[in-house]
């Protein structure tokens, strides 16, 4: 029984003083508040709204606060309102959504709170967390230190902050996401932990991994060894240690154990070579480019490329060129430098091609030599597809067909490599993808593929794999290529320019089908599968009908033009 209630404002928060309470604590207060409490909150919130700064949407926040209090709602959503501060929060809420604001600190948190989503703010610290808290997401902030973590916490996401150390992890924790911080050590993992994201830190040593863990993302740390418990994880578990300087002994041991006939542990992804990133180039963009040209051209080339130094991904492209010069192909392949120089000249003449190529090169952020080589393959593909789309092959259908066949073969090889990766327990997927392209470059006439790679020996790709892959590519090419080519974007671009009337007729035929047949064909397909009224099934059926229609129309057009 509560005989009297006094409310005092202390600092920026509210403290309820309950007098003469018989066997009642603050955490067992009834959900509904007295009118005087409501009046207090409304007064505080009104004043907070009036004192807002330009850009803050405090009027919207005030309305949501008021409705939340009046209706005793459990969830309060103040996300994406450009708020710089928060007032006292309704005491009954269990979920607080404050994502994507400009908050640097938080007020005292309600005592029954279970879920906080506070990512994408500017928080430098967190207040004391209530004992009831089960889920905390404060990623993408500026937090340097975490408070004590409640025992009931099961999900903790504090990635992309400024943490140097973590507190003791609670026993119920199932998910820990702390990637992108400044951690050099980690406390013991709780026995119930299932998911771990620890990438992009400075961790030198891991504690033992609990058997419950099914996913551990540990990329780009300073790990030279792994705990033995990693090999005792379940067979369906996934561990990624790419970008760590694992010792030669560790690599050999892992490879020996994971390739054994009795191995039943997790799949482990690693990377060969120096794991340092190449985001900081050794040279400016202009200098990195001119290094590929003969001395008598360097001055003119430098002047041209200076104009591109502020384009998106220019720095990573410069770093990529630095690393490309140190690959096996650059050192051993005759004419490689001239090939790169000719490619760079084409980039300087086309803003669209340059933008595409800079974006492709941005993905090669690791300095592993074979990753750079695979990126060079992709850049060659980008160039040829761009040239085809721009009209280089408008008068040479044979050359366009040859290019299409190469792109088709590469696509099939990627499918084969993807399937191969799934079968390996200790794998660098870059080496697998590159191995199929490099080792079959001559037999499949892959002009875009480098002819040498450094780490084929660790790819896990066998001679039998290569024979099987070649046979599969040739079989699928014989049965599927013409259908694939009829849907290929560069071929459509050529048809629009060289067969404008036929293209227009094909498009008209497609639109007539959409108007007259599409809905009925989708409905028939859903009825046949017993999925009428299922929105997801309807979208999938619609995509299938559209693809079948385009396949039929564009295949007929392709056959007519190529006849």
From Swiss-Prot:
Region of interest (E3 ubiquitin-protein ligase catalytic domain), ranges: 282-563
Catalytic center residues: 368 (glycyl thioester intermediate)
InterPro entries in UniProt: Leu-rich_rpt, LRR-bact_E3_ubiq_ligases, LRR_dom_sf, LRR_E3_ligase_N, NEL_dom
GO BP terms: protein ubiquitination
Posttranslational mods: Ubiquitinated in the presence of host E1 ubiquitin-activating enzyme, E2 ubiquitin-conjugating enzyme and ubiquitin.
Predominant cellular place of this UniProt entry's protein: secreted
Places the protein is found: Secreted; Host cytoplasm
GO molecular function, one term: ubiquitin protein ligase activity
GO CC terms, sorted: extracellular region; host cell cytoplasm
Outcome of swapping residue 368 to S: Abolished E3 ubiquitin-protein ligase activity and ability to ubiquitinate host RNF31/HOIP
Family: Belongs to the LRR-containing bacterial E3 ligase family.
Domain notes: The LRR (leucine-rich repeat) domain forms a slightly curved solenoid and may mediate interaction with target proteins.
Protein name as it appears in the record: E3 ubiquitin-protein ligase IpaH2.5
Organism: Shigella flexneri
């Amino acid at each position: 029984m509560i005989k009297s209630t006094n409310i005092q404002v202390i600092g920026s928060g509210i403290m309820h003083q309950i007098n003469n309470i018989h066997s009642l604590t603050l955490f067992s207060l009834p959900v509904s508040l007295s009118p005087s409490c409501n009046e207090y909150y409304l007064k505080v919130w009104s004043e907070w709204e009036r004192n807002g700064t330009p850009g803050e949407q405090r009027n919207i926040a005030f309305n949501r606060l008021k409705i939340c209090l009046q209706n005793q709602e459990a969830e309060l959503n103040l996300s994406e309102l450009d708020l710089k501060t928060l007032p006292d929060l309704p005491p009954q809420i269990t979920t607080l959504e404050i994502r994507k604001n400009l908050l640097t600190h938080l007020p005292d948190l309600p005592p029954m709170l279970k879920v906080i989503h506070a990512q994408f703010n500017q928080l430098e610290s967190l207040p004391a967390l209530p004992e009831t808290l089960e889920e905390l997401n404060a990623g993408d902030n500026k937090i340097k230190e975490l408070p004590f973590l409640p025992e009931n916490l099961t999900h903790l996401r504090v990635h992309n902050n400024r943490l140097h150390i973590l507190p003791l992890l609670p026993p119920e924790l199932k998910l820990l996401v702390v990637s992108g911080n400044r951690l050099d050590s980690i406390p013991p993992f709780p026995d119930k932990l299932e998911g771990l994201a620890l990438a992009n830190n400075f961790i030198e040593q891991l504690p033992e991994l609990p058997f419950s863990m099914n996913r551990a993302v540990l990329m780009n740390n300073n790990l030279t060894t792994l705990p033995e418990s990693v090999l005792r994880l379940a067979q369906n578990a996934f561990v990624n240690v790419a970008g760590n300087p694992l010792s030669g002994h560790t690599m050999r041991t892992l490879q020996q154990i994971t390739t054994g006939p009795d191995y039943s542990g997790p799949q482990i992804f690693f990377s060969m070579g120096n794991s340092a990133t190449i985001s900081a180039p050794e040279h400016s963009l202009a200098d990195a480019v001119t290094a590929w040209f003969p001395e008598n051209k360097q001055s003119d080339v430098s002047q041209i490329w200076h104009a591109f130094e502020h384009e998106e991904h220019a720095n990573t492209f410069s770093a990529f060129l630095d690393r490309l010069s140190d690959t096996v192909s650059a050192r051993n392949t005759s004419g490689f430098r001239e090939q790169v120089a000719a490619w760079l000249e084409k980039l300087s003449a086309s803003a669209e091609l340059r933008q595409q190529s800079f974006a492709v090169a941005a993905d090669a952020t690791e300095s592993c030599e074979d990753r750079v080589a695979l990126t060079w393959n992709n850049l060659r593909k980008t160039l040829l597809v761009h040239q085809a789309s721009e009209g280089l092959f408008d008068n040479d259908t044979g050359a366009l067909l040859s290019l299409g066949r190469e792109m088709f073969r590469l696509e099939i090889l990627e499918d084969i490599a993807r399937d191969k990766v799934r079968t390996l327990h200790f794998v660098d997927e870059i080496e697998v993808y590159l191995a199929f392209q490099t080792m079959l470059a001559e037999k499949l006439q892959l002009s875009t593929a480098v002819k040498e790679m450094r780490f084929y020996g660790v790819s896990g790709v066998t001679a039998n794999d290569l024979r099987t892959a070649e046979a599969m590519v040739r079989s699928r090419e014989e049965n599927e290529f013409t259908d694939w080519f009829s849907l290929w974007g560069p071929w459509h671009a050529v048809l629009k320019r060289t067969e404008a009337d036929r293209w227009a007729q094909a498009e008209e035929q497609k639109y007539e089908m959409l108007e007259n047949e599409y809905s009925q064909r989708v409905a028939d397909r859903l009825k046949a599968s017993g999925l009428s009224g299922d929105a997801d099934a309807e979208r999938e059926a619609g995509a299938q009908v559209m693809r079948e229609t385009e396949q039929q129309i564009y295949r007929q057009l392709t056959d007519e033009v190529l006849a």
